[in-house]
UniProtKB/Swiss-Prot annotation:
Entry-linked Pfam families: Sgf11 (PF08209)
InterPro entries in UniProt: SAGA_su_Sgf11, SGF11
Subunit structure and binding partners: Component of some SAGA transcription coactivator-HAT complexes, at least composed of Ada2b, not/nonstop, Pcaf/Gcn5, Sgf11 and Spt3. Within the SAGA complex, Sgf11, e(y)2, and not/nonstop form an additional subcomplex of SAGA called the DUB module (deubiquitination module). Interacts directly with not/nonstop. Interacts with the AMEX complex component xmas-2. Interacts with Cbp80; important for promoter recruitment of Sgf11 that is not associated with the DUB module.
Name the record gives this protein: SAGA-associated factor 11 homolog
Protein source organism: Drosophila sechellia (Fruit fly)
Biased composition (Low complexity): 179-195
Cited function: Component of the transcription regulatory histone acetylation (HAT) complex SAGA, a multiprotein complex that activates transcription by remodeling chromatin and mediating histone acetylation and deubiquitination. Within the SAGA complex, participates in a subcomplex that specifically deubiquitinates histone H2B. The SAGA complex is recruited to specific gene promoters by activators, where it is required for transcription. Required for nuclear receptor-mediated transactivation. Binds independently on SAGA to promoters in an RNA-dependent manner.
Zn finger (SGF11-type) location: 105-126
Gene behind this protein: Sgf11
Length: 195
């Protein structure tokens, strides 16, 4: 039996005819293999049958997708350029530079450029809101009030002398320091022991 006499496949007629068609192909191939002279012819027949099945299957599937309107679904959704990954050096996948930038902030109070790491302490000092700044501000207010009250008392005829109205700020500081030293002397140096 020659390849010209073999039945050729003309396409897939459905999944129901697939099993008988495969069995006829196998039977025809076995008949060709029986004679050693026909091995080349049998290989060509098998290759041609497989190629025809594959091509006809693809054509049928494409035709079905085109008729049903689903052919465009094979292409998929086009990718937006905004969502593409960036593959440039020194940039991350979103296109943002990975190099370190010095971060500077502008102080809203004095309009100076301040490093981001120093912005909070600067703002505290600049606005007078921190612990140390509030102490300084309270001293300023106390000195202003003391100066204005002393000025009012001395300008009026209250009969007092200037020495009585003066507030001795340095003596208060000395007194505070001496009180703190006396507290620490007994507890830290001697550990509560007296000699």
């Amino acid at each position: 039996m020659s390849a010209a006499n073999m039945p050729t496949t003309t396409g897939a007629q459905g999944s129901g005819n697939q099993v008988p068609r495969t069995s006829t192909t196998i039977v025809n191939h076995r008949e060709l293999i029986k004679e050693p002279k026909n091995l080349d012819e049998a290989a060509n027949y098998l290759f041609q049958t497989l190629l025809d099945d594959a091509v006809v299957g693809i054509f049928n599937e494409t035709h079905h997708l085109r008729k049903s309107g689903n052919l465009a679904a094979l292409d998929g959704v086009p990718e937006d350029s905004t969502y593409r990954m960036c593959e440039m050096p020194n940039l991350d996948i979103f296109g943002i530079s990975t190099a370190k930038k010095p971060m500077d902030c502008t102080c809203p109070n004095c309009d100076r450029l301040v490093a981001a790491a120093r912005f909070a302490p600067h703002l505290e000092k600049c606005m007078g809101m921190g612990r140390i700044s509030s102490r300084i501000a309270s001293r300023r207010l106390a000195t202003k009030e003391g100066a204005t009250s002393a000025h009012l008392h001395s300008s009026g005829n209250t009969g007092g002398t200037d020495d009585e109205d003066d507030v001795d700020w340095s003596s208060d500081k000395r007194r505070k320091k001496s009180n703190q030293n006396s507290r620490n002397n007994g507890s830290k140096k001697n550990n509560g022991k007296t000699f």
